[in-house]
C-alpha cells in the first residue's frame, strides 16, 4: 500500500471511552487518531490535519454524525466516513448509507472488522485521488 507518512483518522464520539478504544485500535494498526468529543469540536478545529478517514458516531449530542457527514460532503470533502452506533436503527442505517458512507457498524462489532473497512476506505480514497492528480 502506498500511503502518506501521516495517516490521520478522526474519531468523533461523545463517549470518551469509545474514543480511547478506537484510538488504541487505530494506533496499533499504524494510524494516527485524533479524538473529538462532538461534531462541533471537529468543525471548530481550524488546525486539524488532513484525515484519511473519519469515524463518526451516529448519535452525537448536538450535530449528529450523519449531519456532519452531510455537511462535509456538501462542501466537497471526499474523506471516507465510517459510522459507528450503539443503537442500530434501520432509519439511521439507511440515512447513513444514502450519504455514501464507507461503512456502518455497531460499536460492539469486532474491531478488526471495522478496521478492515477503514483500511479499504483509505486505500480506495488514495487510489481515487491519485487518479485525479494533474500530470
Predicted regions, residues:
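Acidic catalytic/metal-coordinating carboxylates
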Residues: 37-38, 64-68
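Residue-level signal for the "D+5" position in two-component response regulator receiver
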Residues: 35, 60-63, 98
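Non-catalytic signal-transmission and effector/linker regions of two-component phosphorelay proteins
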Residues: 1-10, 16-23, 112-135
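Alpha4 helix (beta4-alpha4-beta5 surface) of REC/receiver domains from two-component response regulators
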Residues: 67, 88-103, 109
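Short amphipathic alpha-helix used as the core "switch/output" element in two-component signaling
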Residues: 44, 66-77
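Acidic, metal-coordinating helix/loop segments flanking the phosphotransfer/catalytic sites
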Residues: 35-53
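The feature encodes the CheY-like receiver
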Residues: 19, 61, 89
Amino acid at each position: 500500500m502506498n500511503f502518506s507518512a501521516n495517516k490521520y483518522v478522526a474519531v468523533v464520539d461523545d463517549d470518551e471511552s469509545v474514543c480511547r478504544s478506537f484510538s488504541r485500535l487505530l494506533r496499533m494498526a499504524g494510524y494516527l487518531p485524533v479524538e473529538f468529543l462532538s461534531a462541533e469540536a471537529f468543525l471548530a478545529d481550524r488546525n486539524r490535519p488532513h484525515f484519511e478517514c473519519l469515524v463518526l458516531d451516529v448519535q452525537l449530542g448536538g450535530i449528529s454524525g450523519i449531519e456532519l457527514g452531510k455537511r462535509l460532503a456538501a462542501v466537497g470533502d471526499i474523506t471516507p466516513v465510517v459510522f459507528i452506533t450503539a443503537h442500530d436503527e434501520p432509519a439511521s442505517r439507511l440515512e447513513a448509507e444514502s450519504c455514501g458512507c464507507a461503512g456502518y457498524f455497531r460499536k460492539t462489532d469486532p474491531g478488526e472488522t471495522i478496521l478492515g473497512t477503514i483500511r479499504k476506505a483509505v486505500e480506495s480514497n488514495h487510489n481515487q485521488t491519485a487518479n485525479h492528480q494533474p500530470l
